[in-house]
Amino acid sequence: MGFFKKIKKAVKKVVKEVGKPIEKAGKEVGKAVGGALGAGKQEIIQQEAPAPVVAAPPPAQVVDVPEQDKAEGEDEAQTESARKKARAGGKKALSVARSSGGGINI
């Protein structure tokens, strides 16, 4: 057990012991004040309110989305190879050339 953990436990124990009498005194004072103000017996009155009527939202409109045809000259093989190449690039794509001269490290 670390040194600070021991200190923390000791402080918690002392605070807990000091707090117990304060809680009891607070409860007793609260009861006395409540009785003096006529709050000895509390009555809870619940009124039932009618549930608010919520109108149903209008249905969503149907939107016609034109289908996009494949661009001319582009087939799946090219796009698949481009994806593989980009994935294989990895960290290489994040590096900055030394001759760029920007002076900003990424």
From Swiss-Prot:
One of its GO terms (cellular component) is virus tail. It holds the Pfam family VirionAssem_T7. The keyword Metal-binding does not apply. Plays an essential role most probably in virion tail assembly. May form a scaffold around which gp11 and gp12 polymerize. Gets ejected from the infecting particle into the bacterial cell. Residues 48-106 are annotated as: Disordered. Transmembrane segments: none annotated. This is Protein 7.3. It is found in: Virion. GO terms for biological process: viral tail assembly. Its main location: virion. Keywords: Viral release from host cell, Viral tail assembly, Viral tail protein, Virion. The gene is 7.3. InterPro entries: Phage_T7-like_viron_assmbl (IPR024281). Belongs to the T7likevirus protein 7.3 family. It comes from Enterobacteria phage T3.
